[in-house]
């Protein structure tokens, strides 16, 4: 289906429900329909670089828009958590970050910041040769050669800071107490601070373990382990762009 009614679209999309009946439906891709923004809608309604959907489509088709360092010519391409949007011709760069009101929002970043993406390891698999494949949240995979496994055997839910589009790993942030994290789901989405405690459940740890995060204002919030993404050691990584 090429389109979707505005009432059926994800609740967080920045759309006027009374303007038109139909809107763009995101194509299958690295992010779920319920957790993404179609590229053309992002350009028109969030970044304001196009006044009409037709203008947004033209920008995409002409190859002026890059997502995670690669030109995307599909105006329905799904853009989601921590994706980097680059418009080199206008010297504009953005990162999609969690927001407490709008769920996902673009924040302006520098050209230097746009070289990096932050992704969580959702699971790992070991092949018959002893190599480890890291399966990341945005659908990409990184293969760790057998000889490098001892030094690069990252735990699941670790956040990797990678170069894009090369996928070279620059830094890793393991999910543990004392690390700086942002909440990426649930009612406290978008709030961030230092992880004070992690209460691990005996079963279904990601769903039922409780993480307490202390914000910069001193207030604490709690969420499930699966909703937490580490974005720094004791402070935010300077290239993230979260304020």
Swiss-Prot record:
The lineage of its organism: Archaea, Thermoproteota, Thermoprotei, Sulfolobales, Sulfolobaceae. Residues 37-99 form the S4 RNA-binding domain. GO terms for biological process: translation. It comes from Sulfurisphaera tokodaii (strain DSM 16993 / JCM 10545 / NBRC 100140 / 7). CDD domains: KOW_RPS4, S4. This is Small ribosomal subunit protein eS4. Gene3D superfamilies: 2.30.30.30, 2.40.50.740, RNA-binding S4 domain. GO terms for molecular function: rRNA binding; structural constituent of ribosome. The gene is rps4e. The keyword Electron transport does not apply. Keywords: Ribonucleoprotein, Ribosomal protein, RNA-binding, rRNA-binding.
